[in-house]
């Protein structure tokens, strides 16, 4: 749609906006139709209520932190963009090209993490805590399997990928884009672990832990970028990403393994209680 509105209808920036609005609107309507069709197929003895305050509040405990997280991420990106703007058009163009390629990878990791989040919720509700850890390990294997070819591609063939967004005459911009990819790509193994772990935390409704890890990553990235950019130039901004990812990952893993330990303790207590009840019955 973007291509059609811009290339053939010559609508420029407005065409991109209208294409986005139309596509997302159609997706929204289709999603609602599919949901209601599946809900109508469900059989239940109880009549479904149109609105439940307890359910609404439970949804809010997960939704509001997620909304805040996305809002603060956007604010952080604006601050980083303002730092980048101070280095001129070439750096801005190189960053714009590299960040598109970076977002392609992060979006792939996020999609897998969302699947892990749903998997975690289902097994948590069923009381199958050991399967949560199995899902976590499977998620790590999947994102690392995806990371290997992407890291090699971005590090070795980053120049040709950046060519997709600019021509060879944009020398400084090209060099900036390649440098960003070579700095960020090796740390995809790190940020992928964070995103999978965050998916487990969200699926476990541990939104406090999720927000702490996410905001720590964001605050560190922005702060370090601001400090290093004054000393190292634009390289300082790109170097802030891996630092934020690494510390955010450590926090996410800390909260995950603490939760895992508590769940297994809970399970062991339930097993002991069942065994004691069986002995009394005998």
Regions found by a protein language model. Give the residues of each.
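Transmembrane alpha-helical segments of integral membrane proteins
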Residues: 220-228
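Short hydrophobic/small-residue motifs within alpha-helical transmembrane segments
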Residues: 188-189, 216
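Small-residue-rich hydrophobic transmembrane alpha-helices
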Residues: 94-158, 191-213
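Alpha-helical transmembrane segments and their helix-entry boundary regions
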Residues: 16-17, 92, 207-211, 237-238
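Short alpha-helical transmembrane segments in multi-pass integral membrane proteins
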Residues: 8-64, 120-186, 228-282
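Transmembrane helical elements of multi-pass membrane transporters/channels
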Residues: 23-27, 31, 35, 53-115, ...
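Helix-terminus/linker motif at the lipid-water interface of multi-pass membrane proteins
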Residues: 4-13, 71-100, 104, 122, ...
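Interfacial helix-capping/hinge residues at the ends of transmembrane alpha-helices
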Residues: 2, 81, 114-118, 198, ...
